[in-house]
Amino acid sequence: MPEMVPTSYYLALSGVLFALGLIGVMTRRTAILIFLSVELMLNAANIALVAFARSWGDLMGQTAVFIVMTLAAAEVAIGLAIIVAIFRGRETTNVDDLAQLRG
């Protein structure tokens, strides 16, 4: 039987991906890049959930990740539609420019 990768490696990978996503959310000014960073954080949480489910031998974690991925696909569709609508109205996706109220 091949040696299995320890759960701590998966959790470390998940932590690194989550940190990269968090840095992206905090430093980027373009709405699309912020959106992609949030998706990276969501996928990092999915990796952690699957790692815990694998270590406990439970399939419910994988089922939960499948549901989360389905909801994330809907989030992507809605989020990109909102970003496109904002771009059509304002000609920019820079969040600093979008924070200003129209007068």
UniProtKB/Swiss-Prot annotation:
GO terms for molecular function: NADH:ubiquinone reductase (non-electrogenic) activity; quinone binding. One of its GO terms (biological process) is ATP synthesis coupled electron transport. Keywords: Cell membrane, Membrane, NAD, Quinone, Translocase, Transmembrane, Transmembrane helix, Transport. It catalyses: a quinone + NADH + 5 H(+)(in) = a quinol + NAD(+) + 4 H(+)(out). The keyword Cell membrane applies. Belongs to the complex I subunit 4L family. NDH-1 is composed of 15 different subunits. Subunits NuoA, H, J, K, L, M, N constitute the membrane sector of the complex. This is NADH-quinone oxidoreductase subunit K.
